[in-house]
Amino acid sequence: MRLGAQFLPEKFDEYIASVRMAEQAGYEFAWLVDSQVLWEDVYVYLTHGLDSTERITFGTAVTNPLTRHATVTASFFATLAGLHPGRVALGIGRGDSSVRTMGLPPARTGQLEQYVRSLRPLLSAQTAKLDGADVRLRWLQQDPGVPIMMSGTGPRNLRLAGALADRVMLYVGVTPEAVQWAMRHVGEGARSAGRDPAELKVSILCAMHVSDDHEGAAAACRWAPAACANHIADLARNNPRHDMPEVMVRLLKAREAYDYYTGHLDSSAAHTAYLTTELIDDFAIAGPI
């Protein structure tokens, strides 16, 4: 098992100290949130994080097709990978707080697919078709080797990730029931594209807090199910005939209003108060090990 840690681009000095600590502790990935309204610029933090460490891989978890044009994303990640070979990954999703805070909906599956299909050639020193135009990064002479990770909660995006991504990030909780359900859809997508599902790299996004105090540890992880519930609600709204597992349905039924501005990814936010320890345990690793 390989471990990664997620970081918010804020409190710069604390961030640098934290990524160094993560590297020393053996973490292999440092994933940064891309949400330009709520936090500082992720590109700046990725760059300084890489400059301040020696081994750990840095990437977005996740960027999106709506606030970052494909050429901008490709140029940045190709540049960064040229400076730090083998230590850069590009995480992409449909967009959550980065777009909802501007009153916009997340990207549709078709938009996400087109974005990734455009990024592949751009990141490989090849020509991409963008809005009918042939576009390439003129300065890029060879493939810098930037793996693409795609996140997913619902079947469509999970299947898309299985078809296109180098790594899939599951955002469905940590129960065997939910993970197996998600992997079934990832596998379907992989096979539809002629890929072997067994060769895909898979990550699970969850909160983790190790402590002898189970209740206290769970309370520290409230942010994870509270945020995931927004994606589950979208899935239920866009696909009423969904087949999501019962653990996700339970969270959906308990879900209350969510305020991105006052406490996104914050376990102390008022909108996490409804979460019981049982619900949290479905979406986090909390307590003694």
Task: State where each predicted segment sits.
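Conserved, mostly hydrophobic/aromatic
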Residues: 26, 49, 80, 119, ...
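Active-site mouth loops of central-metabolism enzymes
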Residues: 1-13, 63-70, 142-153, 208-211, ...
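Short, acidic/polar
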Residues: 11-22, 73-76, 152-160, 289
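Hydrophobic faces of well-ordered beta-strands that scaffold small-molecule active sites
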Residues: 3-7, 30-32, 57-61, 88-92, ...
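Active-site-adjacent beta->alpha loops and helix N-cap segments on the catalytic face
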Residues: 38-47, 174-190
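An alpha-helical appendage that flanks or caps ligand/catalytic pockets
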Residues: 105-139, 179, 184-289
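N-terminal beta1-alpha1-beta2 module of alpha/beta enzyme domains
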Residues: 1-60, 146
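Acidic (Asp/Glu)-rich catalytic clusters
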Residues: 19-24, 46-57, 77-88, 162-163, ...
